[in-house]
Amino acid sequence: MSLRRRVLALAFLFVMVTLLSAPWLQSEDQGVPHFNAAAPAKGATIEPILTKDQLWGENAQFPYQTHAYELAAKIPNVIYQMPCYCYCDRGMGHNSLHSCFAGTHGAQCGTCLKELYYTYQMNKQGKTVKEIRAGIIKGDWKQLDLQTAASIN
């Protein structure tokens, strides 16, 4: 096989592998991310939500990031039962939206933040965990504006 044919074959192979593995060509429907179907068992402990000091120290960025952690600490058993559509269950080993706020990931991810604020609002309106989860799966959280979220109480 000539050198030119080898180069062309390798170039073709490279292009095909690149195209087939490109994220923009993959289906947007990756299924429902992992969540816990029920609240933690009575007496079981779950990882605590980070506090403001643990999260930022002196490096606070946007008020809605810190405020999300304050709200998450009010509803840990609810967010424990919610999926997270940034798919951190696959890349980071998270098992629910709660995992995002037990670490710093939740502050850095718009998806996690929007889902948290959506969950908090729906919980405050008296929606059940199943109703809130159905809204998250449907994508209702996507409409939330993070710039105004810090005023949600």
Annotate each PLM feature.
Residues 66-77, 87-88, 96-100:
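Short, intrinsically disordered, charge-biased short linear motifs at domain edges
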Residues 75-82, 143:
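Short secondary-structure junctions and interdomain/linker hinges
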